[in-house]
């Protein structure tokens, strides 16, 4: 029987002590506070916090910004905060509803602001794992929206995590109190969180390694 390659608890404790807690930024939701995609985003970040990560969330009206215009040099406070948090992020979670088979303009416009990061040492989402969560009322919409979202992450040089979560909004997975009541959905979001945090740890570990000299 093959031996397990899962890190031992002692190894995980040493890893946590040696490297800083990863900072995971979540963006998504709709203009309606408490939407399924917003609640899914917050639940995913809660799982990430349970794994020792620090988190920040941008959703609902926090994503309402002027249409991105590369020719305009001034930025609103919301846009500045978005870009600054993404610059600091070690990992990212994006939770999107499906609007007519794709991501909504609200989210796409927010992602367009990453163009302000094009000249950074880590441009766009470079070097960051990105977990994708899609909420829709139909299987077809889930598939097309997830494909679009993962394609955008690729275009921004991010690493979409191997696992992405798809949630059927019509099943009402969250109760009136905003808490998850479907274990299968919770398991999906936990997997996304685990992969984002794990890859963020790997990235932090690589940065801490001595760089070869000429």
Q: What residue spans do the PLM features occupy?
A:
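Glycine-rich phosphate/pyrophosphate-binding loop and the adjoining helix
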Residues: 2-25, 159-214
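Helix-loop-strand module that forms the ligand-binding subsite of alpha/beta enzymes
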Residues: 4, 77-156
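N-terminal beta1-alpha1 ligand-phosphate binding loop
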Residues: 6-52
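A generic structural motif
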Residues: 51-56, 158
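N-terminal beta-loop-helix "entrance" segment that forms/cooperates
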Residues: 60-77, 173-177
């Amino acid at each position: 029987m093959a031996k397990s390659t899962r890190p031992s608890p002692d190894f995980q404790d040493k890893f946590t002590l040696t490297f800083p807690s990863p900072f995971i930024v979540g963006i998504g939701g709709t203009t309606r506070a408490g939407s399924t995609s917003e609640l899914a985003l917050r639940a995913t970040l809660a799982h990430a916090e349970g794994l020792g990560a620090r988190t920040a969330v941008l959703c609902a009206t926090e994503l309402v910004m002027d249409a991105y215009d590369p020719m305009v040099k001034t930025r609103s406070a919301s846009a500045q905060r978005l870009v600054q948090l993404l610059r600091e992020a070690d990992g990212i979670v994006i939770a999107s509803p499906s609007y007519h088979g794709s991501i909504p303009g609200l989210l796409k416009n927010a992602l367009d602001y990453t163009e302000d990061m094009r000249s950074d040492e880590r441009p766009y989402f470079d070097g960051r794992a990105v977990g994708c969560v899609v909420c829709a009322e139909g299987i077809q919409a889930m598939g097309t929206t997830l494909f679009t979202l993962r394609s955008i992450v690729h275009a921004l040089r991010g690493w979409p995590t191997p696992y992405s979560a798809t949630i059927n909004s019509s099943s009402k997975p969250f109760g009136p109190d905003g808490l998850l009541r479907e274990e299968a959905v919770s398991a999906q979001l936990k997997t996304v969180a685990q992969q984002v945090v794990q890859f963020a740890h790997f990235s932090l570990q690589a940065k801490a390694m001595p760089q070869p000299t000429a």
